[in-house]
Amino acid sequence: MNIRAVGALSLGLIAASAAVAAVGTSSVHRGHSAPSKVSVVYQHELPNVPGKSIKGVLVEYGPGGSSPAHTHPGSAFIYATVLEGAIRSQVNGGPIEVYRAGQNFSEYPGDRHGVSANASKTVPARLLAVFVVDTAAKDLVLPYR
């Protein structure tokens, strides 16, 4: 990745963070809705990396909420930051890790996410996942068995 691509990615991360701040708290956090919610909060084609886009995805887990085992498009590199609460995560059959607010992790193309869940049964958790992915990729979360 060249310097301009890194600059574009940095600007995209800043914009995605601002978008998440603007989204605010949803009913998922008050326990009146499904235990998880996924929303695309930012997307922009990278003009200096033809065919690639940056997409910000806000994942919200109510207390005890989780996502089914999944993977992502083969082109997807993901940088994730926990915004609130704590997230349990397992990638490629490795150890289950717990990431707390302010901590981050990455997923690489082809990784399998076996566990993605709120680590708490009593408080909500939010995660911002920033994808660098083929622009043509529409489904960012794909099931696997």
Predicted regions and their residues:
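Glycine- and acidic-residue-biased ligand/ion/polar-headgroup-sensing regions
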Residues: 74-94, 101-103
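Ligand-binding loop in jelly-roll beta-barrel domains
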Residues: 95-96, 110-137
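A short glycine-rich, His/Asp/Glu-containing loop-to-beta-strand
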Residues: 35-69, 75, 130
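Short acidic-glycine-tyrosine-enriched beta hairpin
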Residues: 46, 50-51, 61-63, 93-111
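Bacterial N-terminal signal peptides
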Residues: 8-18
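C-terminal region of N-terminal signal peptides and the immediate post-cleavage residues
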Residues: 20-34
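Histidine-centered metal-chelating micro-motifs
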Residues: 66-68, 88, 104-118
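Extracellular/periplasmic catalytic domains that process cell-envelope and extracellular macromolecules
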Residues: 49-52, 73, 81, 98, ...
